């Protein structure tokens, strides 16, 4: 029996993780759930999965939940301290980090220090603190298994000897606005940007997919997860989202992992590795399908170029890029900035940052904090 703490249980990845638990009650058990402030949803989860602890970031929401589940034997905690409580208890074996944003960095670090393995769906953790997180995992002998479909695909295609690896190829749908003119992009609304052609995801990652910043974050994540140089990480536009990523070896062979665009597949693999469990999910049927691939250089994706540049520069710059992007995306969703202003804001903040070595958590968090304040200043100016 594997016991789980699920961070972000009310979000897209979190609810799909619970679907895996629901279908495998003999193998998986929920120890703790954590979310932001969605009291109604997490109460339903509490009554179904009977966790021992629930953490909510918002204290008011935690107080309300405590009253709602008073009939259940559940400890309700709040804030970052409460979040850390859910990952450091001795009971859980694996922590699923499915919360969105840089806020996942601290609980991931504490979970590793507490001897937990990580099923990582929070790419911002590695973007902001990749060297620190991967170094901690290696030093403590803990495993970080990718949940992102692209990184799960790469992980499944890897051979034992890393010296045979030539490069990895991340695929991207290209989002809903591939090929649109600047005039068309000026008219993009949050509602239109939230309509992803293939995947059902949360709001922030859906906007990132539209701008291609999501793929940029994934390039940096792949650099850390697989210890690859940036010139060994390629991106291909693949609108059908059937091939989730590919690995090219030194002899020219290319291995690809294919599947339907269903996040439950990489989630389940991260929870069951190194074994595979049967499931009732719809199977991939390639009959009658045409798969196509395009060079992202054929389109104007400034976010992808910016992410490569920030990743190569390293230090605190990726954390700053990520923080500025989080603020800019949420401002767009709140109709405070236009769609085309998102990446311009991020680029401006990155250009103003004095890069430091990202050797400790405090330095990373300080850079993140500065970037958020500066981005807000630019939005208000």
Swiss-Prot record:
Enzyme class name: oxidoreductase
InterPro entries xrefs: DXP_reductoisomerase, DXP_reductoisomerase_C, DXP_reductoisomerase_N, DXPR_C, DXPR_C_sf, NAD(P)-bd_dom_sf
Cofactors named for this entry: Mg(2+); Mn(2+)
Single GO BP term: isopentenyl diphosphate biosynthetic process, methylerythritol 4-phosphate pathway involved in terpenoid biosynthetic process
Swiss-Prot/TrEMBL catalytic activity: 2-C-methyl-D-erythritol 4-phosphate + NADP(+) = 1-deoxy-D-xylulose 5-phosphate + NADPH + H(+)
Enzyme Commission number, as recorded: 1.1.1.267
Residues that hold 1-deoxy-D-xylulose 5-phosphate according to the record: 123, 149-150, 173, 196, 209, 214-215, 218
Keyword Chaperone on entry: no
Keywords assigned by UniProt, alphabetized: Isoprene biosynthesis, Manganese, Metal-binding, NADP, Oxidoreductase
A GO molecular-function descriptor: NADPH binding
Pfam families the UniProt entry points to: DXP_redisom_C, DXP_reductoisom, DXPR_C
Binding site for Mn(2+): 148, 150, 218
Pathway note: Isoprenoid biosynthesis; isopentenyl diphosphate biosynthesis via DXP pathway; isopentenyl diphosphate from 1-deoxy-D-xylulose 5-phosphate: step 1/6
Binding-site list for NADPH: 10-13, 36-38, 122, 124, 202
Functional description taken from the UniProt entry: Catalyzes the NADPH-dependent rearrangement and reduction of 1-deoxy-D-xylulose-5-phosphate (DXP) to 2-C-methyl-D-erythritol 4-phosphate (MEP).
Family per similarity comment: Belongs to the DXR family.
Name under which the protein is recorded: 1-deoxy-D-xylulose 5-phosphate reductoisomerase
Gene: dxr
């Amino acid at each position: 029996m594997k016991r789980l703490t699920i961070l972000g249980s009310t979000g897209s990845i979190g609810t799909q993780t619970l679907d895996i638990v629901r279908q495998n009650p003999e193998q998986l058990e929920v120890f703790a759930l954590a979310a932001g402030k969605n009291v109604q949803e997490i109460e339903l989860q509490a009554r179904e999965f009977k966790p021992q602890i629930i953490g909510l970031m918002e204290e008011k929401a935690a107080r309300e939940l405590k009253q709602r589940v008073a009939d259940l034997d559940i400890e309700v905690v709040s804030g970052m301290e409460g979040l850390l409580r859910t990952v450091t208890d001795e009971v859980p074996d694996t922590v699923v980090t499915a919360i969105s944003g840089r806020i996942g960095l601290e609980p991931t670090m504490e979970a590793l220090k507490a001897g937990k393995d990580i099923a990582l769906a929070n790419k911002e953790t590695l973007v902001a603190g990749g060297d620190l997180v991967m170094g901690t995992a290696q030093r403590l002998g803990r495993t970080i298994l990718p949940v992102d479909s692209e990184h799960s695909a790469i992980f499944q295609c890897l051979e034992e000897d890393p010296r045979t690896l030539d490069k990895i190829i991340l695929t991207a749908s290209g989002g809903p606005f591939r090929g649109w003119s600047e005039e068309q992009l000026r008219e993009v609304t949050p509602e239109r940007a939230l309509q992803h052609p293939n995947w059902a995801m949360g709001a922030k990652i859906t906007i990132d997919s539209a701008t291609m910043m999501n793929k940029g974050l994934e390039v940096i994540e792949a650099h850390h997860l697989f210890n690859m140089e940036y010139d060994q990480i390629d991106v291909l536009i693949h609108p059908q989202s059937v091939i989730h990523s590919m690995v090219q070896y030194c002899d020219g062979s290319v291995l690809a992992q294919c599947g339907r665009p269903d996040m439950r597949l990489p989630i389940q693999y991260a929870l069951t590795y190194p074994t595979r469990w049967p499931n009732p999910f719809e199977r991939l049927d390639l009959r009658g399908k045409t798969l196509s691939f395009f060079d992202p250089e054929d389109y104007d994706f400034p976010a992808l170029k910016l992410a490569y540049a920030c990743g190569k520069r390293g230090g605190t710059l990726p954390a700053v890029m990520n923080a500025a992007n989080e603020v800019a995306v949420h401002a767009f969703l709140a109709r405070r900035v236009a769609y085309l202003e998102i990446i311009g804001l991020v680029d401006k903040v990155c250009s103003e940052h004095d890069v430091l070595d990202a050797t400790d958590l405090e330095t990373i968090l300080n850079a993140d904090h500065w970037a958020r304040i500066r981005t807000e200043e630019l939005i208000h100016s």
